[in-house]
A protein has these predicted regions:
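Short beta-strand
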Residues: 9-13, 62-64
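Conserved catalytic cores of phosphodiester-cleaving nucleases, focusing on short active-site segments
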Residues: 20-35
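Short glycine-/polar-rich loops that comprise or flank the Walker A/P-loop
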Residues: 56-60
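Beta-rich catalytic cores
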Residues: 16
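Non-catalytic C-terminal interaction segments of nucleic acid-processing enzymes
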Residues: 2, 55, 66-126
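Short beta-strand scaffold segments in enzyme catalytic cores
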Residues: 19-20, 62
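Mg2+/Mn2+-dependent nuclease catalytic core
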Residues: 31-55
Length: 126
């Protein structure tokens, strides 16, 4: 157990909206090539994972990884605290790593580093 979190279980379906789960949480984990502040979160992914998490009485955790740093937000907790994601329509690539020329409008919001738990995995000894 790291940080008191029970063992993570990988989602069985490769097309699942979340990546891992444990007794208390659903996790979506993204590895990024750049660090941002704010980070972007898609409203559809947020809504889907919040709905799933609530249906199984868990919290939804969103993690962005960049060069060994984890930026972690408890989205369920932020919603309970009336966090303003500032959702708006934004033109984005249809898919992250494939055809970058095809774009689509997506509803996106923001997550700020000041609202994240930031973990340096390179200097942490569990």
């Amino acid at each position: 157990h790291i940080y008191g979190i029970s063992k993570l279980i990988k989602a069985e379906d490769q097309f699942s909206s979340f990546d891992y789960e444990n007794d208390n949480y659903l996790f979506e984990i993204k590895s990024r090539r750049k660090a941002y502040d704010p980070w972007i979160i898609e409203q559809l992914k947020l809504d889907t994972n919040i709905g799933l998490a609530e249906s199984v009485k868990k919290d939804f955790i969103y993690v962005n990884e960049f060069e060994g740093f984890l930026y972690i937000w408890n989205i369920s907790k932020l919603i309970r605290q009336d966090y303003d994601f500032r959702f708006h329509s934004r033109k984005m690539p249809w898919q992250t790593d494939f055809d970058r020329t095809q774009t689509v409008n997506k509803m996106t919001g923001y997550l700020y580093n000041k609202d994240a738990t930031i973990v340096d995995t390179k200097s942490t000894n569990p």
